[in-house]
Amino acid sequence: MKPFTQHTGLVCPLDRVNVDTDQIIPKQFLKSIKRTGFGPNLFDEWRYLDAGQPGQDNSKRPINSDFVLNFPRYRGASVLLARDNFGCGSSREHAAWALDEYGFRTVIAPSFADIFFNNSFKNGLLPLVLNKVEVDALFAQCQVTEGYTLTVDLAAQQVITQDGTTYAFQIDTFRKHCLLNGLDDIGLTLQHAEAIRVFEAAHRIRQPWLFAPLH
């Protein structure tokens, strides 16, 4: 998992409440067991005017020019600004995969659905909670400033805007450690690889019959 220490990026404002995981990545794209290939279909039903299907050439599909992600000014955005209850709906981990693969490093919102919130941390995507007044201020700045960027400093737990305004945010200490060091569940387990090896060797000595070949 890619570490998250400090990130400066273009902000894309998604001014909708209760964005659910089926809107983030529609159900027809969930057949793959791989963690890649979902970015091109992020917000598929909003980005395109036709019904998307797996394996389509998206470059030939009609674009919804009224959807914010298709605005030229937000191309290359890596910070998604959202509203309350982002990521509600089903528990699909693909939603975090799609956002990450598209290029978003963080989603800033007043609140998140619990399962999406947890899935994001496990996949290197920072779900960052600011209060409604602070989020409203960021939306206002996005509207009046083309090319609006901000910096998220995870170590300092601060959002730093273009004019130098800072917003502090809270994050669980363990989750912060994992993001700073790029540790997913596998990475955390591998930190204890030597202890696991020692345990398995001792286990084989204590209970050798468990490892005897079957006849």
Curated annotation (Swiss-Prot):
Matches recorded under InterPro entries: 3-IsopropMal_deHydase_ssu, Aconitase/3IPM_dehydase_swvl, AconitaseA/IPMdHydase_ssu_swvl, IPMI_Swivel, LeuD
Protein's name in the database: 3-isopropylmalate dehydratase small subunit
Cellular component GO terms, alphabetical: 3-isopropylmalate dehydratase complex
Keyword Amino-acid biosynthesis found: yes
Molecular function as annotated in GO: 3-isopropylmalate dehydratase activity
Gene: leuD
Assembly mode: Heterodimer of LeuC and LeuD.
GO biological process: L-leucine biosynthetic process
